[in-house]
């Protein structure tokens, strides 16, 4: 909701007279909140499906937008196939039916670093080692906690519009478009766009800068010049490949 001109979560108590306007998925802020919350639901469901025996060996990566959804991979398991997709999707719907509260918790930054290490979220563990603030807000769904840069839905009950599709060794988390919030469009493969975006991801992986935390490490080690030189080499090679195709 908007408290005057400030965006606030629904759990926020109003302390005095003000003008309120409720935000929906027709608003950009509301639409982003819905998509962010569904991503949290997806990651929680993946962790529930794989169990708690080996969380540090499994890494859920939400890579990039692809049409109305996000392309995601789950690293550290034998195979991302139809059975795994079905189990995750079923678990997501179960969590929706349970209307689990999505709560915000203020914890010490050092505690957050330890938490992300236990979950195997080493990218966020690295990121928070650079955080100057002594405390951080995390969102929780039952015992599972994670960090997000924006507001969340108050509970899982309204996160019922989504679909999962197997694609290129990963999963597309498909969600409604902004102008049709109660309809999940069919996933239409975008192979050319996928190849370009995947190549960008590979470039980051090859340089060891697949996350912001990793990039911070490189900056503190004074390796920015090397990063720029390698990126320029990648670009020159790509331009050469395009020239060959034209010729």
Residue ranges of model-derived segments:
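Auxiliary tRNA-acceptor-end handling modules of aminoacyl-tRNA synthetases
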Residues: 12-33, 45, 53-66, 71-246
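Short acidic beta-strand-loop surface patches of small beta-rich interaction domains
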Residues: 1-10
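TRNA-recognition modules of translation machinery and tRNA-sensing kinases, especially anticodon-binding
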Residues: 37
């Amino acid at each position: 909701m908007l408290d005057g001109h400030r965006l606030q979560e629904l759990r926020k108590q109003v302390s005095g007279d003000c003008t309120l306007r409720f935000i929906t998925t027709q608003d950009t802020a509301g639409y982003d909140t819905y998509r962010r919350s569904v991503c949290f639901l997806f990651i929680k469901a993946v962790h529930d499906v794989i169990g708690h025996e080996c969380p540090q060996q499994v890494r859920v990566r939400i890579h990039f937008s692809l049409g109305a959804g996000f392309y995601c991979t789950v690293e550290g398991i034998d195979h991302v196939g139809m059975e795994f997709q079905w189990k995750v999707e079923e678990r997501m719907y179960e969590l929706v039916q349970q209307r689990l509260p999505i709560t915000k918790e203020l914890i010490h930054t050092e505690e957050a670093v330890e938490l992300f290490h236990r979950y195997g979220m080493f990218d966020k563990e690295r990121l928070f080692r650079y955080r100057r603030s002594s405390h951080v807000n995390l969102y929780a769904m039952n015992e599972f906690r994670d960090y997000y840069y924006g507001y969340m839905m108050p509970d899982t009950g309204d996160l019922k519009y989504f679909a999962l599709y197997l694609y290129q060794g990963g999963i597309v988390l498909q969600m409604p478009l902004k102008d049709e919030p109660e309809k999940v469009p069919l996933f239409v493969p975008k192979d050319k766009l996928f190849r370009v975006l995947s190549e960008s991801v590979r470039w980051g992986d090859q340089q060891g800068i697949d996350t912001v935390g990793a990039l911070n490490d490189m900056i503190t080690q004074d390796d920015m010049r090397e990063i720029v030189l390698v990126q320029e080499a990648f670009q020159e090679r790509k331009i050469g490949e395009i020239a060959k195709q034209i010729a």
